[in-house]
């Protein structure tokens, strides 16, 4: 760890549901000059975040899934208004070089990877001054983990459910952002 110059990433579930603990951990890490990164889906109390976690955070990986609030509620369980507002706030800090923010879009076939959704996300990125982002290709390995979490129900959202995303689909998704001048990083 020390030889590599690495840092500490806290992710979840939603790590920011434990802001007291994350803030304390990051505070101690910063005392040792360790780089800190939080991965979030964006559903958190910004005032608490601003006081407890932000002062000790170097980088935020901020996942955005769906722009339509009804679809977000259907698939994620909550509307996305506060998520978008939190993104605007942290991205404003990134524009002022207070913190590094990397927006990320997890691609789920026929849900988050539609042209309509990705175009809306791209427009939202432009409105917020984003020039670089990451897309996270769908990975079907999670399906085999469901029984370990007590779930016997296998979700099915079409023929893409059990397959890795083909390169042509990743190219299509990438082009939606890059055609608007947003650089996309994607691990294939």
Task: Give short role names for the model-derived ranges.
Residues 1-141, 147:
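Conserved AdoMet/S-adenosylmethionine-binding subsite of the radical SAM
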Residues 179-188:
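Radical SAM enzyme core and accessory elements
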Residues 27, 92, 127, 168, ...:
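Polar/charged alpha-helical tracts
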């Amino acid at each position: 760890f020390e030889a590599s110059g690495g840092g500490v990433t806290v992710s979840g579930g939603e790590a920011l549901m434990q802001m007291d603990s994350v803030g304390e951990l990051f505070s101690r890490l910063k005392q040792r000059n360790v780089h800190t990164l939080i991965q979030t889906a964006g559903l958190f109390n910004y005032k608490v975040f601003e006081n407890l976690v932000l002062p000790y955070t170097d980088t935020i990986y901020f996942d955005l899934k769906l722009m339509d609030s009804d679809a977000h509620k259907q698939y994620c369980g909550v509307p996305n208004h506060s998520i978008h507002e939190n993104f605007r706030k942290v991205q404003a800090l990134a524009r002022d070089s207070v913190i590094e923010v990397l927006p990320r879009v997890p691609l789920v076939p026929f849900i988050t990877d539609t042209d309509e959704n990705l175009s809306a996300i791209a427009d939202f990125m432009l409105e917020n001054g984003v020039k670089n982002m990451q897309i996270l290709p769908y990975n079907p390995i999670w399906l085999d983990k469901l029984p370990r979490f007590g779930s016997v129900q296998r979700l099915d959202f079409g023929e893409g459910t059990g397959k890795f995303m083909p390169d042509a689909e990743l190219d299509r998704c990438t082009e939606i952002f890059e055609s608007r001048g947003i650089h996309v990083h994607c691990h294939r």
